[in-house]
Amino acid sequence: MKQYVRIGFVVFFLVQLIQGQDTYTPLKAKDSKIKIDGIIQKGEWEFSEKIELDYEVNPGNNISPKEKTAAYITYTDTHLYLAIHALSDPKKIRASVRSRDDFGLISDDFVLLRLDTYADGRNNYLLLANAFGSQLDARAINALTDEERYDISFNLEYETKGTIVEDGYQVEFKIPFSSIPFPNGINQEWHFNITRQAFRDGIPIDIRSQPFDRTDPCQVCQTTDKLILSELIIEKRTELLPYVSGGLGGKKYTADAAIVYDKIKPNAGLGMNLDLNKNSTLELTLNPDFSQVEADVTQIDINSSVALEYPERRPFFNRGTDIVQYSSGAFYSRSINNPLISTKFISQGKKERMYFLTALDQNSVYQIAGEDRSYLGSGEQSFVNVMRYQRLMNKNSRMGLFSSNRFYEKGGYGNLFGTDGWFLFSKNWRFTYELFFNINEEPVANWIESEDQILDRSVQLNGERFKGSAVYLQLYRNTAHWKSYFSLRDLSPNYQADVGFVVKNNRRWATLYHVYQNFPNKEGLQFFSFGTKADLNYTYQDYLKAISVDGIISLSTYFNTVINYTYDWDIFKNFLGRNYRNVGKSELLLDSNPSESISINLMMTFGKDLAYNEEVPEIGRDFSLFFMPGFQLNNKLKLSPSIRYARLTNLETKKNYYNGAITRFSVRYQFNNFFNARLISEYNTFTERFFIQPLIQWNPNPSTVFYIGGNQNSLSDYNRELYSLFRIDQTQFFLKFQYLIGI
């Protein structure tokens, strides 16, 4: 009997394996046959292959979904076409009209096409659209967390239309082959799959065209359905991206005076994208306008001893950056602050990838990492080189080289060289490494004012030469119920990355992470996990820096709510030569989307923390809060108020080291998928400054944009003379028109 059971199990496993990788060979259609209007017409998709989405992968584990979905895929010489019919009660469909890459789209009903055009799991290109055809695209890489895995700054050009119909909704995609990276050749074999997100009793349901293995740590490797395409026409892109812009600014020179305006400041620049072949692209930008359309969300840094990192929003620097992402902070594109000219070469072959970037930076950022503090200065002009090469040895291993150089105009340099690797030993085990060393000569400059010392080296920039190194090793294991990793980090006292982001060094750091996870798939408990993370940190001088143990709990429950709780217990901690014991605090995260109309994001910390920026740091009572509800009033209008609050109180005197808040309010009206108007205001009690930013934007594709707006804010210098919450002391108006021209 046992033999029959074993045979039956083997047969079942083989059937699942075969089902897990299907092959689709659609017939080639004619462009004139398909009209992208969001309505699937009879005869329109007669050349297509039909694909059923038969697997609910979350919260169910590869079970048959209640929601039925059919997809149709075909192609022409120059485009890939996809249509999806998602059956549903129209009244229960969640969707709003959104601008491109609005992250709120992931809370909608949507459909998603995953493409692994190199069929090797290096990355996936994700093309999403909701029921109104609003788009979000991203690139996914093999990473441990969603934050590291998805890059939503990545952009592809594609066309979508969506319509809500009597039995659900329909979405049609038209994707130019010229916008998709893939290997050379007119005949292609890609990997792909299709996903639909639906909602059942308020809970998001992940439905796919192929099964998903929760025990496999490589999510992008599980895009394995084959798509066979023949005799494509490979079009090389030659694109020009000119822009014109203008700004008018002014400010008060005394508290009770009128605003005095400067002269209008016109500007112009040019970008160029040139396909050398299907795998290689050369990009050039001359006098680029890298001003941000929307202000960064202000972070509270009053109790931070190091510089804070902000996300990259500039499209030129975002393209191709998945190949230069490092755990050791070796590359940070925002360190290239204000380039006058920059060039970039990207090549993606079947077995290798290359990335080469040059820039003439007019206002260089200079950052020094210390054992407990970082030091940041604004410098002068420098020339930057970044080179990255990666070799894909086989499906389960890849290795690479990296170098970056920054040469300062008036002397000094920073060179960084390194190697890295990624190895998959089995479905459950993965090993990664990063090794770097730097050679530096400081400029002689007054960019940083500090009398501090880093061992035998002064923080002041006086031409000193030094060398440093960094090592990062990680062993990772993932099964159906256990997720674990062990990592080692080694940063020497003089490790510095002049084109990177390194804020702490002089540490040898070991981390052990071990978590149990389960998917009960119950109405009140779809997922839960609990575990621990332990850290042990020594310096290069062999004295103990920190011992820390975290308790971690996570669960998904009613009302589409995810709750994460962490207790961070610093058993021992050394800061600026002083020892502290039993410093513990809690962190609570709550993310809830109970309906299409309401979303809630909450982060709260409470417990003990150090007053890091006091002359003599002491332990205080900490409380901080971030709360942001979202209100989707209709399909086009959204309100997003938020508050960030932070307080640290002396345990003995009960006096506050600091106590303040940043309140922010955003209202957006989306006329259609390309045109919106929004208003952002913010008041910061730490600096006692107020600003308001109105903006109108038209953005029909990732590169073409027109916007007009302004910034109005108060100046804290005048607060004592004339205090008013909504006072305007400084103002700026700006507009920009940038248009993509294909040649």
What spans do the regions from the language model cover?
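A short local loop/turn or secondary-structure capping micro-motif enriched for an aromatic residue
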Residues: 44-46, 89-93, 135, 146-148, ...
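Bacterial Sec-dependent N-terminal signal peptides
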Residues: 1-25
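Contiguous, well-ordered alpha-helical segments that form the cores/surfaces of helical PPI scaffolds
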Residues: 388, 418-420
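Short beta-turn/strand-loop junction motif enriched in small, turn-promoting residues
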Residues: 176-180, 406-407, 517-519, 682
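Structural preference for beta-rich elements and adjacent junctions enriched in aromatics
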Residues: 20-391, 400, 411
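Primarily recognizes Gram-negative and organellar outer-membrane beta-barrels
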Residues: 233-264, 314, 364-383, 388-391, ...
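Exposed, low-structure sequence patches enriched in small/polar residues
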Residues: 338-340, 346, 414, 422-425, ...
